[in-house]
Amino acid sequence: MVIKKPFIFIFICFLICLLICIDLTNCNTINNNNNNNNNNNNNNNNNNNNNNNNNNNNNNNNNNNNNDNNENHKILKDYLKFTKRFKKSEYPTTEQQDFYINKIKKEIKDREKYKNNIENEILKINSQKKRKKFKRKDLNTDIKTNHEQLRKLIENNVNPNPHYYDETQSFYFTNRMTSNNEKNNKKNLNFNNDNNKINNLINIKNNNIPYINNNNNNNNNNNNNNNNNNKNNNNNNNNKNNNNNNNNKNNNNNNNNKNNNKNKKIIINNNNLINNKLVSETSANMTTMVNSGDASLRSLINFLTTQDNNGLRFFPYSPRDLINPFNATKAISVAFAYNDRQLITPGAFSKENEEIRANQSRSQGLFDPNSPNMNFSSFYDIIDQQQTNFVQNIELSIDYLLNQVYFKEIFSKKDFKTQARDFEALFEFLKQQGTRVVYYYIANDGSNHVECGGSIKPCQDLAYLLQSVPMADRIQTDLVVFFYPGRYNITKRIVIDNFSKVQLVGLFGKDETTLTSNQKMFLFNNTHIHMIGLTIADVNFQMKPLLNIFKTDNLGTGTVFDLRQSIMTILLCDFRNISNRNSLGSVFAYNSNLTVSNTLFENTIAAVGGGIFCCSYSTCIVSNCTFRANIADNPIGGGALIASLSTLFITQSAFYNNKASIGGSVIIDGGFSTVDTSTFEYNTGFVGSAIQISPNSIVYIVNCYFYFNLATYSGASIFCGSSTVVFISKCIFKDNYSPGANGLESYSEKLVLIEESVFEGNIPPLLNSTSVVSIASPSAFLFVRQCSFFGHSGVIFNIGNPSVLYCSFSLFYENSNRIVNSFNNGLIVFGSCKLFNNSNNKSDGIFRINNRSNGIFYAVEFYNNTVSSFFESWFNSTCFLLSSNITNNTFRAGSFQVAFSTDIFVDNLLYSNNTAAEGGLISSDQTGGISVTNSLLIGNTAEFGNLVFFRLLSYSEPNCDSFIFENNTYVDNYAFMAGTIVYFDDTIRCNYSCINCVSVNNNAQYGEIVNTGFATFSSTLPNTIPPSIIRPIILQAFDALGLPYLGRSDITFNLLINLLICDQMSLTGVVQSTSTPTSFSVFYNVRISGAPGTHCNLTVIAFLKTFKNITLEYPITVVNCQEGQDPYNIGGVNSYYCLTDVSKTKIAKIIIGISAIIVSIGVLITAILTFIYRKRKIMRYSNPVFLLIILVGCVCGLVSTFVSFSTTSATCSIRMVLIPLFFFIITSAIFIKQYRVYCLIRGVEELHDMSIENSYLLKLQSFILIIPAILIAVSVIATRMHRKYNFDLQKETIQAYCYSKNFYIIFICLALYEFSILLYGCWIVIKCRQYRSFPGSFNEFFYIGVLIYVLTVILVVSIPIGFALLNSALTDFLLYSIPILVLIVAIIGLLFAPKFYFLFRTDKVIANLRQLIEDQEEILKKNKEVLFTYGMYLGDNNNDIIALHESFSDSDILSKTGSNTSDDVSDDFTFDSPTTYSNIPIPLNRRNNNNNNINNNNNNNNNNNNNNNNNNNNNNNNNILNNNKNNNNDDDASSSNSSSTADFEISSSGESGRSSNDYDKRNNKKNRRKNSLRTPILNSLLSPNSRNKTKKRNKSSQNSPLLD
């Protein structure tokens, strides 16, 4: 279609658009002053001029567009990749194609020009200062330098985005145009396009507006865009003027409207609780993007509130719609001036409106929601007007209350006389005014009579007083009842019905007057009542539960006050310790007006509404009150206050420690409510611990403080039910807790607005919460504006179901969890927000947008955050990031984490100085669309892909057609591993290409700008290899581009053999390896084992983390071992190793072999000699059977030694039997022999007879060998020894040794048994050591004792060494051989060698014996002389010679008692001794015998002391010698006897001559000394038998071997 007169057509379109703009401006903009209007007109004129220029340019472009259709179609197809996803059903018209083709061509030219300029400037910069390799510490300096250089360059070639560019922002790239008209045109187009992106998305989602308008040609599109730009510019100017001048809103002249955003403050209890810096920073960040005049916000709000098909309306048009004053019903309050909508009108509490009126005038200044002029601004007008009416009427009501009391000036005075005087003056004043007021007094000491009630004669009972009031006074007079100080017990319920006005006043205030009762106290019906300065306390009773609390005839539902269609004001009162678990609040209001001011509710308990219960179109005003520790016992809840189907206004009040199941402090159930400047602390409940908002309610919460409220389910601060509209402004939420949402939990499908509020948490938190704000209802709208969220450990916004979150001009900092969690078709919009200093230890992003949800982020700043990622989006979701800034952040994954067909659109982004792991900006699975345009990436670091990291494919197929990368700049980016800009984790599925992009100084540690994942590998396996030769195998990995696979360590290589095909080869060593960042991998210490000549294929498998694998096979042949080595099959089937046997060294074998042969010859010779001389007495002396047993044991030991030269399973089993037999045979034989000697010594028998009977020997030895035999049999059966190899693969050596898993149990038992025998034998040897054989006799038991010692030492030494050097073949060989050979040599030397010596050297032995005897005689003679010398010396000193030495001690003799005829008489015995025998006469012939006995005893004692043994044979010999001496020396004996007899006789006669006694004593001592020095004769030493009383040997008995 060709237009012949285009200028006329353009002019008509321009006029139409101008009229539309004027109309929209009049409807939606704010009226400014004349100066601002002039400025706007000038701006509009300028824009109109620009639009004319744009139209001319567009016409010129259209006239110059004459390209070929095929080429145009190709270009258009590339351009529509982005648009194709939104509208696939319709194809653009020819006019639209021409328009887009011309546009694309021009943009391509501009991009090329811009690219060339950038490259030239970069080259200049590099030539001036050589760039260093990127390092993190130089990042800030590099960026600053680059910014300074690039800013000049960009300003010369690029016109930045005009509506968001300022000096604090970095570079935002838009389309590059050079001419002024093109810049202005592009400026308007960009602004319009940005504002329309949200509108287009919403309209397309609901299939209302197509992406491409087919009904208009390209000229009309341009004109419409210009007109829209004019409108937008006007709106922006108006908004700026509005923010600076605080103008009033359009169509509303109310002076009480909202002020500008810069003057807003958050005030709670007259204290500024928000930092001025925070408020100023929040206000300063507001731009024209999101406000009442902005096109994008207006479109979103209009769409959400005016569309009929989306199921969401902005206002709740329900029967209890409290903001619509034009839908009045017949339900009119009969008590006060309110209609059913509860809109307070001006003058409602004025004196002129005291009478009840049936009709009510409309409120002024309100708008009809159904009016066509209803818009976003007028909505706030409704709220502001309603709030203004509340404030005005509350002030009027308080003033009216104080005026009606009449005594506000004298209320606090406690002087009664002063009060009486003031009252008289007041009464006189009232009479002059004509006011009918009647005053009554009540006192505890008053009396009830007809004349009571005055100040002098007060009444006692209030009920009596009210009953006595005349009917006329009830209707026409104001009754004021004063309570004197005291405590009043109300015993009967007081009913006040149809009174005009009753005022109950406590004189001197609430601290002096208290009302109490044990039942319900007051009922007010159709009455105006004031309660001032009273305390109601200690009311405790129970009443029956109420079935229907809303029946009008069911009166008495409140514990203290019941209001029915009445007006009540409570001022300066206290309600304490009131309990009625079946009541509806301490104060119950039904269809009434209740005002409570400066009042305390403490420790009140009720079923529902612990303090106040307002219902059924009541109006409840609570001002400056405190609710503390109130409880609602019924699950309906309302710990402090409930307002049901009523209007509630709370201001400057505090709620502490209240408790209920639902609504720990306040429940709002229907109606319009305002909570202003109040505090909620330490309240608890199941839900809504501070405020519970039930369905069909509209609540305005402003300037409130919520601190440490606890909910066991959710909504610790506020819980909203369905169909509620909630406005939260200038509030602070701090340290609240619930398992759900600790700030706000909403099930409303309508509107929740939060503005200028602070949500503060603790890190670490005292108690963890799931979220801060939670929207659980479908199709809900959450609007957050100018708020701050910091210090939270839970999710801040939890948006479920298809709901909408719009957040603007808000701050998020120092949080440690997600910001948004949205799923199930939710819509998230963030505009002009800042996120900084946040951290997230979880694996998901701080914005989680899943399950077909959409996220739009415009002009958002992210800086100094340490998180896993910013955006996590899965399952067909969409994310838009427009005109934003991401700087100085640290990501554990990447900024975007998307998968499962999720689309990403990034435009005009500054991404700088960020550190990330896999994927700096985007990490995608290639299943969704990606568009990154007009963006700058500078100074970023990542492990892989600073721009995009393409992860492994998910279950969906890749969507390559939707990848768009255009007009981007990449500067100074660095990758720790590979892929500086783009990295494909898998093989390339979609090619990466960037149109008109610039890349400068981007580096990677290992790879290039673009790298891919693992594709294939190669190895260095040889074709032939000996068995088990250590050989490394080197692998190298490659990517899909044929380059080395760099920067990754995620490939696992396995080397294996297919045993099903090749079962004659085995593989050991490090057969698994992991790839390194340098692409190389090594199999270390690989041993391929098999019999020489085996052929097989080795398989190398590369396992990827996607559970995929790549397999390559290599043929290999096993060849023979090297010289000096043999193949050994160790460790398994076909596990051959080329090893050197080092089990027994040659030197050890030679030495042990020669030694064993020599010992064997010695044993053989010994056996032969023993057999030959078996009948000789010297052999019979030891018992030949005993010697034969010893030789048999030696043979077992020698056999085991020779067997140990070969280590096989059979030899191990033989040795396990022979070695224990050897030791136990030897041990048992010598033990029995030694035990025989011990028995002889203990029995004091003839010591020369040490032979053992054969039967005794065999029986005893068999008995000892029973236990070893059993243990050896068990070891052979249960723990059989077998051969085991001990090899060292590094040294390539092998050793064979005997091994049994559980043999150590048998060994321990054998060792314990062996050592028990040996230790007992050692003890016997020690016991027998005192025995000294006669010189020249053969002492065999001495050699046996030595042999026992030797055997014990051998075992004690060898067993620890064997355990210390366990599993050593050489140690095993030596320990089995050396101890056995040493013991056999000891046996031959100690048992057999002495016998052979006696056999072959008899003469020599006798000669030696004689020489020994002669030597002993000489020694005896010398000893005699010494003793005589001692005796002579001691005799002169009158001392007993026997006491000179311990050998002559008579202590043993003196200790004995017995007859004087005993042979054992002490040598020291004298007649002077104090014994019982001193006076007995002794015959003369007995004295010699006594002397002889004394001498004999002395000799016996000497022998015993010297030998330490009771040797009876020596005693007998000494007796013989002494008798001979007595016979040879009769003269001496007679003289000594005579002298002794004389001494005895003198003593017996009783004479006491000292000289004679001394003489006798000296003679007796001489005789005793003489006899004591006598020695045995030599012949007695040589006699084998004793001469005195000894038993002769039988011929069969063996004598000493010397006599043989």
Swiss-Prot record:
Q: Which gene encodes it?
A: grlR
Species name: Dictyostelium discoideum (Social amoeba)
What stretches pass through the bilayer? 1150-1170, 1185-1205, 1212-1232, 1257-1277, 1305-1325, 1341-1361, 1373-1393
- Which residue ranges have biased composition labelled Basic residues? 1563-1572
Highest taxon listed in the record's lineage: Eukaryota
Gene Ontology cellular component annotations, sorted alphabetically = membrane
Q: Which PANTHER family match?
A: GABA-B RECEPTOR (PTHR10519), METABOTROPIC GLUTAMATE RECEPTOR-LIKE PROTEIN P (PTHR10519:SF66)
**The name this protein goes by in its record:** Metabotropic glutamate receptor-like protein R
- Name the membrane topology term: Multi-pass membrane protein
**Coiled coil ranges:** 98-133
Concerning its family, UniProt says: Belongs to the G-protein coupled receptor 3 family. GABA-B receptor subfamily.
Asked if NAD is a keyword of the record, the answer is no
Cell compartment(s), UniProt: Membrane
Q: Where is the composition biased (Polar residues)?
A: 1573-1584
